[in-house]
From Swiss-Prot:
<comment type="function">
    <text>Catalyzes the formation of phosphatidylethanolamine (PtdEtn) from phosphatidylserine (PtdSer).</text>
</comment>
<keyword id="KW-1003">Cell membrane</keyword>
<dbReference type="InterPro" id="IPR033175">
    <property type="entry name" value="PSD-A"/>
</dbReference>
<keyword id="KW-0444">Lipid biosynthesis</keyword>
<keyword id="KW-0443">Lipid metabolism</keyword>
<dbReference type="Pfam" id="PF02666">
    <property type="entry name" value="PS_Dcarbxylase"/>
</dbReference>
<dbReference type="GO" id="GO:0004609">
    <property type="term" value="F:phosphatidylserine decarboxylase activity"/>
</dbReference>
<dbReference type="GO" id="GO:0006646">
    <property type="term" value="P:phosphatidylethanolamine biosynthetic process"/>
</dbReference>
<keyword id="KW-0472">Membrane</keyword>
<keyword id="KW-0865">Zymogen</keyword>
<comment type="subunit">
    <text>Heterodimer of a large membrane-associated beta subunit and a small pyruvoyl-containing alpha subunit.</text>
</comment>
<keyword id="KW-1208">Phospholipid metabolism</keyword>
<feature type="modified residue" description="Pyruvic acid (Ser); by autocatalysis">
    <location>
        <position position="203"/>
    </location>
</feature>
<comment type="pathway">
    <text>Phospholipid metabolism; phosphatidylethanolamine biosynthesis; phosphatidylethanolamine from CDP-diacylglycerol: step 2/2.</text>
</comment>
<keyword id="KW-0670">Pyruvate</keyword>
<dbReference type="InterPro" id="IPR003817">
    <property type="entry name" value="PS_Dcarbxylase"/>
</dbReference>
<keyword id="KW-0594">Phospholipid biosynthesis</keyword>
Length: 236
């Protein structure tokens, strides 16, 4: 019979571990906002206690808005996962952004619309190498409009998988969202489900997959970034 005993865990240690597993971490882009809100809260509280309460609520909201939940991507080969949390707005054939150099042949485009209440980080849809990253200035139309894909400010990224399959993911600014963050660079090796960017305050993300791919979602369906399988990819 084994006489080994499991190490004891103090209630405080258990509580800290539970909080770490329950409360999602915050994306680095949100730290200046949270810090600014916290400082403002402390200053205002000295003048009026009620302002301190409101400031505390604002600080908590900023931290919640920039949350970056832990996600586990499917391990299947030959699939593309959702690049963002949100609602599928469109599934259609469309020519990818010209700046990616993919030519004029249509690909299948799946558009995911994010409201202000959704998680606003973007996830890598396919493991592989980043072969192109291109930013283009544009308008700030409402992200749920069809022409937002063509007219709005955007940041496009092209990824080539190990088998040569290429997918593109495009961050699109919206009526309120006017700040696109992309941490990926050309030549980077990226993993499906990992965070690569963020769009502030409501936006849209377009995923382009090979035209003959089998799309597994439909308009109106909710997606979970890094986990929902968007399509089974046609081989290169």
């Amino acid at each position: 019979m084994s006489t080994e005993q499991e190490p004891k865990t103090s209630p405080l240690t258990h509580l800290v571990a539970l909080a770490r597993d329950t409360v999602p971490p915050m994306h680095p882009a949100g730290r200046p906002f949270v810090l600014g809100a916290a400082v403002a809260t402390l200053l205002l509280r000295r003048r009026w206690r009620g302002a301190g309460v409101l400031g505390g609520i604002l600080t908590a909201w900023c931290a919640w808005f920039f949350r970056e939940p832990r996600r586990t991507a499917p391990t299947r080969d030959g699939i593309a996962v959702a690049p963002a949390d949100g609602t599928v707005a469109h599934v259609e054939k469309a020519v990818p952004p010209a700046e990616l150099g993919l030519g004029a042949a249509p690909m299948t485009r799946v558009s995911v619309f994010l409201t202000i209440f959704d998680v606003h980080v973007q996830r890598v849809p396919l493991s592989g190498e980043v072969t192109k990253v291109s930013y283009r200035a544009g308008k700030f139309l409402s992200a749920d409009l069809d022409k937002a894909s063509e007219d709005n400010e955007r940041n496009s990224m092209l990824i080539r998988g190990a088998d040569g399959t290429e997918v593109a993911v495009v961050q699109i600014a919206g009526l309120v969202a006017r700040r696109i963050v992309c941490s990926a660079s050309e030549g980077d090796q990226v993993l499906a489900g990992h965070t690569y960017g963020l769009i502030r305050f409501g936006s849209r993300v377009d995923l382009y997959v090979p035209a003959d791919s089998r799309v597994l979602v439909e308009p109106g369906q909710r997606t979970i970034g890094g986990e929902t399988v968007i399509a089974e990819l046609a081989r290169a």
